[in-house]
Amino acid sequence: MSSILIVRIRGSASTPWDLQEVLEMLRLSKQYSAMVYPKQDDIVGMVRKVQSYVTWGELNMDGAKALMARIETVKGALDQSFIEKELGLSTEDFIKKLVDGELKLNSIPSIKLPIRLHPPRKGFKGKINSFIGSGGELGYRGEKINELVRRMV
């Protein structure tokens, strides 16, 4: 099983209440917030319901390393000492388990969720209110989500 990364692109203005509830269930209440989940049918179903507000794809090692810089704990940034002390893992093992879907970020109580990101450097390549296939930024983008995350960290 692998992990998927979901990033909310659009804001909350004029969002229907049912889609807003699904976004809150996914912990994506604000624009440019991100979450990592194991790839399961129920999560993918919720993401497809709100795909006009988010972009998502499979997380790989490079994207997870970049994303690690933005994960915060109660005591500050996520660093090697926290991972070794709280989880008993090395940094590489933590990233590998996160990418493989074996580790859930929401199961670690001292990590602040969701992961807050910046708008991408050099802007979006397409429109933020249309889908990837039609020259936009929304919807499923596969492995290209990692390139977007590197620009948003």
Curated annotation (Swiss-Prot):
Name any GO cellular component annotation. Answer: cytosolic large ribosomal subunit
Q: Which domain of life is it from?
A: Archaea
**What would be an example GO MF term here?**
RNA binding
What the entry lists under Pfam families is as follows: Ribosomal_L30
Among the GO biological process terms of this entry, one is: maturation of LSU-rRNA from tricistronic rRNA transcript (SSU-rRNA, 5.8S rRNA, LSU-rRNA)
> Hey, which family's this protein in?
Belongs to the universal ribosomal protein uL30 family.
Q: Self-association or partners: how does it assemble?
A: Part of the 50S ribosomal subunit.
Q: What protein is this chain from?
A: Large ribosomal subunit protein uL30
Q: Which organism is it from?
A: Metallosphaera sedula (strain ATCC 51363 / DSM 5348 / JCM 9185 / NBRC 15509 / TH2)
Give the gene name: rpl30
